[in-house]
């Protein structure tokens, strides 16, 4: 893994790819082929499988991302533990541009004031799907696979 100007906590596992200007807190984990760009924070034990792209994204503790995901300009919270956590299925993409190609504000899947307490229902975003931002999604939301 090529790492430039990142902050790493203890027991962080970065298995391959590129990370720049990002923060990985204790126990964060990214699989091979990761592309983690500036402004990204993986909080404690947040993780992604192989070939995950992140930019200006905050994953609260325990959040799990599947493989082949592009998840930029997002905050994802929810869940209470390693066994009860928010999850994004494989092959998910978050689109965050206007029809004119201009960047919009970030999407919120959960929120910080409640998510930081680790006492909210997890959010599940099914694989082979996507979202067109900006969106605000509440705790406990379940989106089936293949949905946009």
What residue ranges belong to the model's regions?
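Flexible, glycine/small-residue-enriched loop-and-beta-strand segment within the central core
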Residues: 1-135, 147
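C-terminal, active-site-flanking charged/polar segments
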Residues: 142-148
